[in-house]
Amino acid sequence: MQKDKFGPCAPSRIPLLSNDLISMLSGGVAATVSRTAVSPLERMKIIFQVQNNKEYTSLTSTLVKIWNREGLIGFFRGNGTNCLRAFPYGAVQFATFNMLKQRALKNRSHQNLENHERLLFGAIAGAASCATTYPLDIARTRLSIETAGLTSRSLAINNVANNSLKVKPLTLWSTLLYIVQHEGGYPALYNGLPATLLNVVPYVSICFFTFEFCKQKFFSNADLTAFQKLFLGGFTGIIGQTLTFPADVLRRRFQVNRIPGIGHNYKNIKSAIFHIYKTEGINGFFRGYSSNMLKIIPVMSITWYTYETVSKMLHDL
């Protein structure tokens, strides 16, 4: 029994949704909203990372080229696929972390994770969300560069002289089908997964650790204001991405490794690292970093703000 506006003998309130389901729904909504908000910056980052020439050299020139070639819709190329991936990605990630957190704290007198638990649970959440949605991640990357003029196929799409060839832009399903049919069957849908895990696992681990640690250390796990949610979310993104960005470059390179016209032909992660360093120097590992920082701060701010807000709203149902 609990005291409330109905008096001391009012029945205890029964939650409408379980904690795991709330985490899943909140995480899915947060990921979808944040990815859509920064879709133009995400597309520019991917183009910077995978290009094999110097066609796209700055944010301004890239904005102009996308606008001239594709119009407004070009800035959101691949976002539909990204949203299809973002919802389950965010849902699995947040639900996994919070499920592990709840189990760990179940029989404890205090409600704070140890630092190593934050890192471990974040890593597991990152691996789980990445593995379950990876084919959609590959498709999103392919669609992002499909009309950017980086491949022989995309040049045909953009070349008016080739209109008679009826080379049509790929869709989500045709992209997945093309990969299966021409790049090695169903296992090809997971090309580059090790490089992706090398990026995603430490990134998600660092983000969960940073947010949880700062929320406990500086705000005593109290409900955060809107500004605090936005600020802390952006801060976690800066820390996580700066420490793991070279792995993100490797991730994108492997996802387009077999596309004709790109020119990359990496055999494994080690050969890719040596080749990038030899041909592009240390700067090659930070291609797209500036545009990514413009993206990651708002995306993580929006993600954590939306997650915390939606989660509280669902708990109050």
UniProtKB/Swiss-Prot annotation:
Q: Which UniProt keywords apply?
A: Membrane, Mitochondrion, Mitochondrion inner membrane, Repeat, Transmembrane, Transmembrane helix, Transport
Q: What is the lineage of its organism?
A: Eukaryota, Fungi, Dikarya, Ascomycota, Taphrinomycotina
Which Pfam families does the entry link to? Mito_carr
GO terms under cellular component:
mitochondrial inner membrane; mitochondrion
Q: Which InterPro entries match?
A: Mit_carrier, Mitochondrial_sb/sol_carrier, Mt_carrier_dom_sf
Q: Which GO terms describe its molecular function?
A: 3'-phosphoadenosine 5'-phosphosulfate transmembrane transporter activity; 5'-adenylyl sulfate transmembrane transporter activity; nucleotide transmembrane transporter activity
Protein name, per record? Uncharacterized mitochondrial carrier PB17E12.12c
Q: Does Ribosomal protein appear among the keywords?
A: no
Organism per entry: Schizosaccharomyces pombe (strain 972 / ATCC 24843)
Transmembrane ranges, per UniProt, are: 14-34, 72-92, 119-139, 196-216, 230-250, 291-307
Q: Where in the cell is it found?
A: Mitochondrion inner membrane
Membrane topology, as annotated, equals: Multi-pass membrane protein
